[in-house]
């Protein structure tokens, strides 16, 4: 069977052991996150070759190969708090879980409706400062920011505020556990990306035009913790790259005495069709080990 490859992978990372990711505990084999919005995915292998050289011209006589490395790189169009946690080893705080509240930063332009007071969209946090700056008719700052005093509910008191004046407000507010929900990602200096069991399903098309299920399995991959977040107002939207190094380990459902860096499974069942193959993960055909 010969085939061509022109399809992206859907990737799942599963817990290798009972482990915590982003503040949540996953048992061995439990899926941590599915990646279904990838733009590219690449498996790259490399080896180091050294040679015995000699004779006239010092030509190569014998070669030795070793230091085999395998890397799986995927580029995701979308990002989630959990994927950030996987990439960086960060902890997640969910305002809906437990009693811990998240303090959020907000800015708002407000026109004075009541003498000496401003009405905000959110209730200012009791322990946080509120700063206001008066704006002119063109929306420019007219002076330095001054501290306001918290009032009742969403109201703050601003000395000298006249009806019709406009202020720019910088303040903080808390999640309330009901309507206002938030997630917080904490990237710590001593936490890094972990090890996972990777399965990447895709389609290989044979010479008859039939798409056959194929799967890359890396039984032990370590997520590199390097990352770049690019923000721009023009051009293509940012993508997010995950690079994982493969380490030898046995397959979860295979010969436990044989360690591999990667296993590639290709289904060559002649009775399958395109629709069935696109959703199947059965591998009745050859398995290629690296």
Where are the model-predicted features located?
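Hydrophobic beta-strand residues in large extracellular and virion-surface proteins
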Residues: 11, 130-132, 146-148, 155-158, ...
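Short, hydrophobic/aromatic-enriched beta-strand segments in well-ordered soluble domains
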Residues: 76, 165-175
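Mixed-charge, glycine-accented linear interaction segment located at domain edges/termini
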Residues: 152, 157-163, 214-290
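Low-complexity, intrinsically disordered segments exposed to solvent
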Residues: 59, 156, 179-180
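Extended beta-strand solenoid/passenger and fiber regions
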Residues: 81-148, 173-197, 202-212
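Short, structured patches in soluble enzyme cores that scaffold and shape functional sites
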Residues: 76-78, 200-202, 246
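Solvent-exposed edge beta-strands and adjacent loop segments
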Residues: 1-87, 140-148, 214-241
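Extracellular interaction modules
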Residues: 66-71, 159-168
């Amino acid at each position: 069977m010969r085939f061509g490859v022109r399809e992206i992978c859907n990737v799942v990372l599963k817990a290798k052991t009972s482990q915590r990711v982003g503040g949540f505990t996953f048992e061995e084999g439990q899926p941590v996150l599915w990646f279904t919005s990838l733009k590219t995915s690449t498996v790259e292998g490399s080896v180091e070759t050294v040679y015995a050289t000699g004779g006239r011209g010092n030509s190569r006589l014998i070669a030795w190969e070793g230091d085999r490395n395998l890397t799986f790189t995927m580029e995701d169009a979308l990002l989630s708090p959990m994927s950030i946690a996987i990439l960086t080893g960060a902890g997640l705080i969910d305002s809906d879980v437990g009693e811990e509240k998240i303090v959020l930063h907000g800015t708002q332009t407000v026109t004075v409706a009541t003498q000496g007071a401003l009405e905000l969209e959110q209730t200012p946090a009791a322990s946080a400062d509120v700063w206001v700056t008066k704006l002119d008719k063109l929306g420019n700052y007219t002076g330095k920011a001054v501290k306001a005093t918290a009032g009742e509910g969403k109201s703050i008191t601003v000395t000298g505020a006249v009806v019709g004046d406009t202020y720019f407000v910088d303040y903080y507010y808390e999640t309330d556990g009901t309507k206002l929900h938030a997630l917080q990602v904490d990237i710590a200096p001593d936490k890094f990306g972990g090890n996972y069991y990777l399965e990447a399903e895709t389609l290989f098309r044979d010479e008859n035009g039939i798409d056959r299920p194929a799967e890359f399995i890396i039984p032990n991959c370590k997520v590199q913790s390097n990352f770049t977040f690019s923000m721009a107002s023009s051009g293509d939207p940012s993508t997010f790259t995950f690079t994982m190094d493969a380490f030898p380990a046995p397959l979860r459902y295979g010969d436990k005495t044989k360690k591999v860096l990667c296993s590639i499974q290709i289904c060559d069942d002649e009775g399958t069709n395109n629709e069935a193959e696109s959703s199947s993960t059965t591998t009745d055909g050859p398995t290629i080990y690296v």
